[in-house]
A protein has these predicted regions:
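Glycine-rich, hydrophobic membrane-spanning regions of integral membrane proteins that mediate transport
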Residues: 1-199, 205-227, 233-249
Length: 249
C-alpha cells in the first residue's frame, strides 16, 4: 500500500470524516476556530500587531459566526419540541429546569435568526434595534444555561444520595454484585453531570458579558468559548465514533 493510500484510508481520517459528516461535528469545528480567532485577535492586538493582522482574525471570527447562525436556522423548533416533551418527566425539578432550559435556548435561537438576517444584509435593522436583539439573545442564552446549571446541581445532590445508599454492604453475594454495578453506574452519571456543568459554567461567561452582567475581555471569552467548543466536540466525537474512537483521538 502506497503512502498516499495509507493516509487516505487511515482509521483516524475515517473517524474525522464521520465526525464532520454530522451537522454538530461541523458546528463544533467551526466554533473552535471562531473562538480561537477571537482570542488571537485580542492577543495580537495586545501584543501590538498590525491592524491588518488583527482585522483578518476578526473577519475570520465574524464569518464563522455568521455561517454558524445560518446552520442554526429552524433549530429553535427542536428546543420547543424538547420543552413540550419535558413536561412528561416525573421529577418536577428536573422537568421544570428542562422546560426552562429548552425555552431559553429556543428563544435565543429565534433572535439568533434575526441576527443572521442583519449580518447577511438580507434585512438591515437600525443600530439600536440590532443592539437590543443581540442583548436579549444573550439574556435568553444565559437563561437556558442557568436552568441547566440548576438542573446539574440538583442531579449532583440526587446522585450523592444514591451513592451513599449504594456504599452500604448487602446481605447476599448476589445483592453485593448488583451494588457494585450500581456504584459504577452512579460514578459514570456523576462524571457526565460534572462535565456538563463545567461546560455550562464556562459558556455562561459569554452571554453574561453580552447581557452586560459581566465585563470580561475578549481574551477570556475567546478561551472560554474555545474550551467549551472542544468539550462539545469531544462529546460529539464519542457519540459518532464511540469511546474507543475517543481514546484514539
Amino acid at each position: 500500500m502506497s503512502a498516499l493510500q495509507q493516509i487516505v484510508l487511515h482509521p483516524y481520517l475515517s473517524q474525522t470524516l464521520r465526525f464532520w459528516s454530522t451537522t454538530v461535528g461541523r458546528d463544533k469545528t467551526y466554533r473552535s476556530v471562531q473562538y480561537l480567532a477571537r482570542f488571537l485577535a485580542w492577543y495580537e492586538y495586545r501584543k501590538g500587531a498590525t491592524k491588518e493582522t488583527v482585522q483578518r482574525l476578526q473577519n475570520l471570527k465574524s464569518s464563522l459566526a455568521l455561517s454558524r447562525k445560518l446552520m442554526r436556522v429552524g433549530k429553535f423548533l427542536e428546543h420547543l419540541q424538547a420543552a413540550l416533551k419535558a413536561t412528561a418527566i416525573q421529577d418536577p425539578i428536573v422537568s421544570y429546569t428542562a422546560i426552562g432550559r429548552q425555552l431559553g435556548y429556543g428563544s435565543y435561537l429565534i433572535l439568533d435568526q434575526l441576527q443572521w438576517l442583519h449580518g447577511s444584509k438580507a434585512y438591515q435593522f437600525s443600530p439600536e434595534t440590532i443592539k437590543k436583539i443581540s442583548k436579549n439573545a444573550a439574556r435568553f442564552w444565559l437563561t437556558g444555561l442557568s436552568f441547566s446549571l440548576i438542573s446539574g446541581t440538583y442531579k449532583t445532590y440526587v446522585l450523592r444520595q444514591r451513592l451513599a445508599a449504594a456504599k452500604r454492604p448487602r446481605a447476599t453475594a448476589e445483592k453485593e454484585a448488583e451494588r457494585k454495578i450500581e456504584l459504577q453506574q452512579i460514578q459514570t452519571e456523576q462524571a457526565g453531570v460534572y462535565f456538563q456543568m463545567t461546560q455550562d459554567s464556562l459558556d455562561w461567561l459569554i452571554p453574561a458579558t453580552g447581557a452586560e452582567f459581566l465585563d470580561l475581555d475578549e481574551g477570556v471569552l475567546g478561551l472560554a468559548g474555545l474550551a467549551t467548543s472542544l468539550m462539545g466536540a469531544r462529546t460529539q466525537w464519542r457519540a459518532v465514533n464511540g469511546p474507543a474512537g475517543a481514546a484514539k483521538k
